[in-house]
């Protein structure tokens, strides 16, 4: 996801 990439 966006936060954990």
UniProtKB/Swiss-Prot annotation:
The modification Glycine amide is found at residue 5. Keywords: Amidation, Growth regulation. Diapausing first instar larvae contain both amidated and non-amidated forms. It comes from the Eukaryota. Suppresses growth in rat hepatoma cells and maintains diapause in insects. This is Yamamarin.
């Amino acid at each position: 996801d966006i936060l954990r990439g």
